[in-house]
Amino acid sequence: MNDMVVAQLSPEVVLGELKKQGVTHVVWLPDSETNWLYLLMKAEPTLTLVTVPREGLAMSIAAGLAAGGAKPVILIQNTGLMESGDSIRGWLIGLDIPIVLMVGLRGWTRHGPTKDTAATFTEPFLNAFRIDYYLVENDADASRIAMAFDQARATKRPVAVLVGDEFHGFNK
């Protein structure tokens, strides 16, 4: 098998992990990197997609959904994560909301120095808020999504999944 195929993160695998965790709502800000996952989520009858105009609003919406008994996940990019600091502090951490933030790690690379400050500051940002995180780069890492959900439940805190690769087209 071609190593390039093995090393990809397929949207089907990510969606499968979300379904295994019983996710009911995806609160997200659409972007070009999540297009393939979006097409699958849109067709999935067990998911409700909640689009937000700014990432900071995702935190309060997800907190309300969780308080009402739903099981949301937040899907945003790292730049939006950093824009959302006060909402994370007040809504998620302040209210003990056990939620997974799936964060696109824009600008990150395993192949040499990271040149984009969006990627450079993501981990220090998460550390400042004491938010634990898991890196998911390919399908072999997908079980870390379940680990993040388990940890969020156990700690009643947000936990991040850093998506270190763009979702690739349908692998069918």
Where are the predicted features?
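Thiamine diphosphate
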Residues: M1-K172
